[in-house]
């Protein structure tokens, strides 16, 4: 994890009627946590090419949520990565990749599945800061009577060169230095489709190229010092699940259906291993 930072999720005023759905129905500001990480299951230097993850947890969101047993929680999660499409096109490929990673032998899986290996190689990259790339939902979500994908895009991109001799966790250091000097913002956008063919929902390796992304909110990361032992533990113990959401934004497709239980099991395993209770924060001041 590069850092878990304090942010505000600010729904835009004056949205077009077709965008005023669920979470975006009214202009409003939510306290949020934004956790940046590498996607690799193995601990590796930040200078190595990888997918980067951005997990966003909004707090104080009213309304019933879809995740079993957490219907009354007041959080809403978004999970995004630094590539627009996923490595696996269906649950079978997703399960095979997951088992290979859990067994510590993804290389053998890639050798047996060259198409997935090619997708992996085209999706990873090197970045000078977690604030540099755009992040995507990859999978599709309901948007009332339409289907949406999400994007988190820097409002004003900044140059972030990779150091000539980067430290093991230089992305954390870069994020710390940047947020010590001031705030930073991302635009939160949706890409909408009406009645897409099932394959464009089920196959997460397919990009939607024709529909524009439209801004619905802004994510304002506050100026702060997040690099403390307590915040590191807090961030590592946060749980994210795409099904912790309002019904208007229901996750769609086989990959999302699989993530519902896979992510819950991974969260339970991590919290048991760390002897940490799993709680959903209600505000910035709520540390569980």
What name fits each language-model region?
Residues 1-288:
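Active-site-adjacent core segments of small-molecule enzymes
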